């Protein structure tokens, strides 16, 4: 049987099959050493094959990914850290104040997403906190990213903008990310 990983906690994986039933699973012992160049071989979004043992349910095979979001592993320079896979879109939450999301963080995220065939929606949050100067900076960044093909939204989640976000996410497997 196979299913999709919907949650990971330590060495436990929650996998949902196509009938909607969920299973708590672990990785088969030798799974982690099979030519995998990432720090985490199985991530949320992965499709996996399961084996039912008398004691527990094991993930025995990782099925091919249609896409993934990766970052460089912090301590292991030649390895990557996969954040999610098989996603329909990534939502990158950006703040220009309290705290500031750096332009380099945004660009690194976009490069990784583009290289791995993931659509990204940029969401500038905390509109209610922005000064006139920061609103100008946001307008500039919005124009830059729209010009190169990204959908950009400016919101304040304190207001009624959550309904807009729910509509964007509707019927899609989404990854939400920010700098912290």
At which residue positions do the language-model features occur?
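N-terminal accessory targeting/assembly segments
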Residues: 1-103
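Cofactor-binding loop segments of dinucleotide-utilizing enzymes, especially the Rossmann-like FAD-
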Residues: 8, 95, 125-126, 157, ...
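Signal for well-folded cores of large energy- and translation-related assemblies
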Residues: 10, 111-114, 146, 170
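Residue-level signal for inorganic ion chemistry
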Residues: 45, 113, 125
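Conserved beta-strand/loop subsegment of P-loop NTPase cores
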Residues: 87-94, 117-127, 149-154
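Short histidine/acidic/glycine/proline-rich micro-motifs that form metal-
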Residues: 96-99, 127-132
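Histidine-anchored nucleotide/phosphate-binding helix
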Residues: 104-119
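Canonical P-loop GTPase G-domain recognition
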Residues: 129-180
């Amino acid at each position: 049987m196979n299913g999709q990983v919907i949650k990971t906690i330590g060495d436990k994986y929650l996998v949902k099959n196509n009938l909607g039933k969920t299973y708590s699973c672990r990785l088969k012992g030798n799974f982690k050493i099979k030519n995998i160049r990432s720090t985490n071989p199985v991530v949320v979004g992965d499709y996996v094959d399961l084996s039912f043992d008398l004691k527990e349910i094991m993930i025995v095979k990782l099925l091919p990914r249609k896409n993934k979001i990766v970052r460089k592993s912090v301590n292991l320079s030649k390895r990557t850290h996969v954040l999610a896979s098989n996603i329909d879109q990534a939502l990158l939450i950006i703040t220009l104040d309290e705290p500031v999301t750096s332009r380099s963080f945004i660009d690194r995220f976009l490069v990784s997403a583009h290289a791995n065939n993931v659509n990204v929606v940029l969401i500038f949050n905390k509109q209610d906190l922005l000064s006139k100067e920061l609103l100008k900076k946001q307008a500039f960044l919005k124009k830059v990213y729209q010009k190169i093909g990204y959908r950009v939204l400016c919101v304040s989640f304190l207001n009624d903008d959550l309904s807009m976000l729910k509509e964007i996410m509707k019927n899609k497997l989404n990854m939400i990310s920010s700098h912290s």
